[in-house]
Structures are given as structure tokens and as C-alpha cells.
Design a protein with these regions (language model features):
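Insoluble glucan recognition modules
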Residues: 1-198
Length: 198
């Protein structure tokens, strides 16, 4: 708290020329400073950029898909070369909101050994030790006046749903695509059992 000195000014009908008067200086001994609280909002878009699959891709922004019915969740299936590095960013430009290894919670469910590219730097790039296709999920949550980020690093799994698999809408390994081992390989669909929508 700090002291604040004020004076009151009065006039007639708001006219500065009619009966203008000023009070003595008044000392308010303890005034608490106030700053309006800013509430953060969930990002509407999410991108990743980095040295995947080529080292010169830091100026290219890969947009993650918003998850249907899950505000603040974004995902994509991405190929990373060995020791590729990347960052997460709600902007498709370097605007100061990018997140590095120490600025988000890491949930690596792949054994790919995600590490910091520079342990001494909180905002360092996220490094993927093992090459392969991965499902990248970025979860965001409002925490007061900031947004918390969680990076879920999952195996790349793609499934066939709809009429073409007989109308089954359950997760079933019989309807899982074969994931390629290389960047340019094909995701191979299981055999379709019927005609119709996918």
C-alpha cells in the first residue's frame, strides 16, 4: 500500500467558469494498487515447426487439427527424422508465444526419448531421438491469466471406420492401417468389407 494525495474540484453545472473551487490536499495514507485481472483464453489454432523432416523447415508451420468436441485439443500425425527438433506455437509466426521443452508438460507414450535440445534453456527445442511416425497431441487449459500446455506424444495409429468395415465404430486392430517405417512410405488400409462411406 502507498500514500496517495488528491484534491477535489467542484463547479456549477459542469461549467468551469461558474463557481470553480478546489479542496485542500487530502492524503489517503494506504491505497492498494489495482490491476484488472486478465483471463486467458484457449487458442483456436496450433502449429508445430522444426527440423522435421528437413533441417531447414523452421520457417514452415504445420497446422495441427482441432479435435472435434474437445476445445483446446489439437492433433496431427507427423514424421520425425532421428534427432529432429521442434516447437509448439499457437501462431504461425515467431510472435513470442512458442513453447519449448521446459514450457509444457511432456507425456511421451512412445519410448521415443523426447529430450531437451539444451537442458540449460527452458525454451529449448523438443528433440525426438528416434525416427518415425508419431501422433502429436497438444492439450491446452486455461489457468488463471495463462494457458498451460501438455504435449502428448503417441504412436501413430490410423483406423478405418464406417460402412466400409461393416459398420463397426469400435477401436479394433483388424481395422488399423499399417504404418510405414519411412517418411515417404504409404499407410496401408485394411481390406474393405463393404461399399459405403468411410
Amino acid at each position: 500500500a502507498l500514500p496517495v494525495f488528491i484534491r477535489l474540484r467542484a463547479n456549477i453545472y459542469g461549467n468551469e467558469n461558474l463557481g470553480k473551487s478546489l479542496s485542500n490536499t487530502i492524503r489517503l495514507p494506504q491505497v492498494l494498487p489495482y490491476a484488472p485481472q486478465v483471463t486467458a483464453t484457449l487458442p483456436e489454432k496450433m502449429y508445430i515447426t522444426g527440423s522435421f523432416p528437413a533441417a531447414d523447415n523452421w520457417s514452415k508451420w504445420v497446422m495441427l487439427n482441432p479435435a472435434y468436441g474437445k476445445a483446446g485439443y489439437f492433433y496431427g500425425v507427423v514424421y520425425f527424422s532421428a534427432n529432429a527438433e521442434f516447437k509448439v506455437n499457437p501462431d504461425n509466426a515467431w510472435a513470442g508465444r512458442d513453447k519449448g521443452f521446459g514450457q509444457l508438460t511432456i507425456d511421451d507414450q512412445t519410448g521415443s526419448n523426447l529430450v531437451s535440445a539444451d537442458a540449460a534453456n527452458e525454451g529449448a527445442n523438443i528433440k525426438v531421438s528416434n525416427a518415425g511416425w508419431y501422433t502429436v497431441v497438444v492439450e491446452t487449459a486455461v489457468n488463471g491469466n495463462k494457458v498451460d500446455y501438455t504435449l502428448h506424444f503417441l504412436p501413430a495409429e490410423v483406423y478405418l471406420f464406417g460402412a466400409t468395415n461393416g459398420g463397426t465404430w469400435e477401436w479394433n486392430n483388424n481395422f488399423r492401417f499399417t504404418v510405414p517405417a519411412t517418411e515417404n512410405g504409404d499407410f496401408v488400409s485394411p481390406a474393405l468389407s463393404a461399399a459405403g462411406e468411410v
